[in-house]
Amino acid sequence: MMKLKQLQHGTTTVEFALIGFLFFLVLLAVLEMGRLMFTWNILAESTRRTARLASVCPIDHGDIPIVGNFNRPGSSGDNNFIVRMNEANLDIDYLDSQGDETSTFTDIDFVRVRVVNYEYGTIIPGLSISLSAPTFTTTLPVESLGFIPDTGTFECFGSAS
């Protein structure tokens, strides 16, 4: 009986280590999945915000992708919510009634904004995976494009451009 008890010394420690490893692996996977869903939501919201701004601001206004990316007008840099997302990842297209790109003010009927070249990186230690974001696209009909009929000027964010 004494010999059997000596052979089982340390089995609890090994079992705890295996179960602990699996528990933390599942915990990190759940956290990473939540972070991925949050990132996808922010990407979709960025396209929606940018398309909304592009439909009511002049087509040459440089702050549209900056503000659509959750930053202040005139600033630049990464999105305040997710890393490696900046205004260069937002592609703004002005479309005519047929869906073709145009830059003629009177022909613009729609605004399309897409997320391009965004790479999602995991934060799990020792597991560095990079995922390309799916295509997030928002298309909205144009509104004023910043034109104020009473004054004949173009304005956005409270300032004339």
Where are these regions (language model features)?
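Alpha-helical assembly-interface signal, strongest on the long, hydrophobic N-terminal helix that forms
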Residues: 2-70
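Short, conserved structural patches
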Residues: 52-161
